[in-house]
A protein has these predicted regions:
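Rhodanese-like catalytic fold shared by cysteine-dependent sulfurtransferases
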Residues: 1-35, 42-75, 84-159
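Short, surface-exposed ligand- or partner-binding patches at beta-edge/loop junctions that are enriched
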Residues: 78-80
Length: 159
C-alpha cells in the first residue's frame, strides 16, 4: 500500500517532538543553549529568519548536516515556513542519529505573524547556493575573456 503525503507527515509527527512558537520564544528569551536550523529555501530565508538560525535547505539536509552539526547530541530546533518540512527534517535527523531534535509547529509564518523578532540579513548558508560576490567576480572574468576573444576575432578578420 502506498502512503499519501498526509500519511507520511502524520507518521513523522507521531515520531518527533514539536515545540510551539511561544515555547521557543521563551527559551530564546531565557538564553537556553540550542541550535536553530532553518530548512526553508533561499528565497524564503531572504524574507527573514529567526536570529541565530543556520540555513541548510531541506533538499540538502542529509548531504550537509554532518558538516554543520558534528555532535549528534546537540539540542536542535528545526523550522520551515509552516511546520511540514521541519517535521520531515526532524524525523530524518533522528534517523541519522541526532538525539535532541524538535520541530517548531506552525513554522516561521506563525512566528512572524505573532510579531516575534525577524532578522533580515541572510543567515550562514550551508546549502549549494554560491555567494553573489563569487558569481559577480566570475561573470567579470568571463566578460574580460569574451572581450579578448572578440579582439582576436576582429584582428583575424582584418588580415
Amino acid at each position: 500500500m502506498s502512503l499519501t503525503r498526509d500519511d507520511v507527515l502524520n507518521q513523522a509527527k507521531r515520531e518527533i517532538m514539536e515545540i510551539s512558537i511561544e515555547e521557543l520564544k521563551a527559551r530564546l528569551d531565557q538564553g537556553s543553549p540550542l541550535f536553530l536550523l532553518d530548512v526553508r529555501g533561499r528565497e524564503e530565508v531572504e524574507q527573514g529568519y529567526i536570529e541565530g538560525a543556520v540555513h541548510v535547505p531541506r533538499g540538502f539536509l542529509e548531504l550537509n548536516i554532518e558538516q554543520v552539526v558534528q555532535d549528534r547530541s546537540t539540542p536542535m530546533i528545526v523550522y520551515c515556513a509552516g511546520g511540514v518540512r521541519s517535521a520531515l527534517a526532524a524525523k530524518t535527523l533522528q534517523e541519522m542519529g541526532y538525539t535532541d531534535i524538535v520541530s517548531m509547529a506552525g513554522g516561521f509564518n506563525d512566528w512572524r505573524d505573532a510579531g516575534f523578532p525577524v532578522a533580515r540579513p541572510e543567515p550562514e548558508n550551508h546549502g549549494t547556493e554560491r555567494k553573489t560576490a563569487e558569481l559577480e567576480s566570475e561573470i567579470e572574468q568571463l566578460r574580460r575573456q569574451l572581450e579578448e576573444k572578440e579582439r582576436e576575432l576582429t584582428s583575424l578578420k582584418k588580415r
